[in-house]
Amino acid sequence: YDKEIARLGHQWNSCQSAGGIKYPKPSKHMLKVYKKKRNCIHDYLHKVTRAVVNYCKANDIHTVIIGDITNIRRNKNLGKVTNQKLHALPYAKIYGMLEYKLAMHGITLAKQTEEYSSQCSPHAPQVTKEYAKKCNRTNRGLYKDQLSVYNADAVGAYNIMRKYFAGCGKEKKISVTGLSSPLIIKVAV
């Protein structure tokens, strides 16, 4: 939608400025494209959050731990296209929707910082800078440990959960099985 909005904006502004209008308003067509983009994002977020809630209810989960990515966009330059995509994601809206939908079913949502979660081995004693190694992330999406190869996102989520339990004082031994092939759920096509 972004490219279509940019194309329409350029086309409309050139028509308006040729006519001598100093501050052109967006066209009706451009407003429709904006609305369609907003509605698609809103619909997708509702589908994703509903899928999370349904999964939690089906598996008797009472606490959802999510990475706190506050200030993820600050002082980062990841390239023109990636910056546009990263800044377009409505993180606060996702947190809000998850929180109210989980609360309706008596499930709590906990935020946990993500420092070093994707760089530490799942077998490391703690998730800290001391045990973090960037060299373990050799390929995109893969985390290579001494003996095993894991999915990098699954290792990050596992370590976020470990950090949460360590912060609560609930040291739990959690199995590392399933980190190499996580469950993928298609919510919307």
Residue positions per predicted region:
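Positively charged, helix-rich recognition surfaces that bind polyanionic ligands
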Residues: 1-189
